[in-house]
Design a protein with these regions (language model features):
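Conserved N-terminal catalytic/coupling substructures associated with nucleotide/phosphate chemistry
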Residues: 1-260, 264
Length: 264
């Protein structure tokens, strides 16, 4: 119970149900499903309805079989080899490199990258995304803008291919375009980017990992004179609201700002 304008009111919080989507029975699932967006009630879009159906069945898009793609044992072996090579490449300490184990078909199945049905192995959407062979493979679009809005366009790049390679390319592109300063520590000079590189990488990685791959559209990385904006397609995750985000809610968000430091 709460007091509002000197009146006692009962506040009821209704949590989302598990058997989604909920719809008006007389209109049917396709025509009778609605969502709340920015304080308005709207007819659900096709991609969002697919997401609701998967959620209601406790299924996930990346673990679904990619019916438009076939995979051979040779393809799987090459992919496993690339995964291990990537892990070794991104590990700095030799002692840690020695601990990296081979990736096998069974491991990919346990990760949901491959799926086994009736003794046959199929590629999932995750496999297609990680190999760059997804029908209508999404890309990362990067743009540089002069000032604090999109009125003056300076440069643009679009990165294709496997999503993990897109992520690395977008990260390197941002590093090339932001300013670099320096700091003195003891007797030595150390180069320092104007934005924390770990945060940039984390933001791009979150955009790739948590976007909606059912929604048409691409991740956009926009660098302005005073900030970096990264936007990924999709709605907020279940049980995530703007107010919870402002309170430090720990789940990832679809849109994020990274503000540049200012000097006087």
């Amino acid at each position: 119970m709460q007091t509002v304008n000197d009146k006692i009111v009962i506040v009821v919080e209704i949590f989302p149900g598990a058997q989604r989507p909920y719809y008006i029975k007389s209109q049917g699932m396709v025509e009778g499903t609605y969502v709340r967006v920015s304080g308005t009630t709207r007819h659900v879009e096709g991609y969002m309805l697919k997401e609701l159906i998967l959620e209601g069945q406790n299924r996930y898009f990346d673990c679904e079989i990619c019916r438009d793609m076939q995979v051979s044992d040779s393809d799987i072996e090459k992919f496993c080899k690339r995964l291990k090579e990537t892990a070794i490449k991104n590990t700095w300490q030799e002692s840690e490199k020695a601990k990296i184990k081979d990736v096998t078909k069974n491991i990919l199945i346990s990760w949901g990258i491959l799926k086994e049905e009736e003794g046959k192995v199929y590629p999932t959407n995750a496999y297609a995304l990680l190999t760059g062979k997804m029908p209508q493979q999404p890309v990362i679009q990067c743009g540089i803008f002069k000032g604090t809005n999109r009125a003056h366009f300076v440069d643009r790049r679009e990165f294709e291919g496997p999503i993990q390679e897109q992520m690395e390319a977008a990260y390197q592109y941002v590093l090339e375009k932001i300013n670099m300063g320096m700091t003195i520590r003891g007797m030595y000079r150390q180069d320092v980017y104007e934005l924390p590189t770990d945060s940039i990488r984390e933001l791009i990685a979150n955009a790739v990992a948590h976007r909606s791959y059912l929604e048409p559209g691409n991740i956009q990385v926009a660098l302005f004179g005073d900030r970096l904006e990264i936007t990924s397609p999709g709605m907020l995750l279940n049980n995530v609201t703007i107010s919870k985000m402002m309170e430090g809610y720990s789940k990832p968000v679809s849109y994020t700002h990274l503000t540049l430091p200012t000097t006087e």
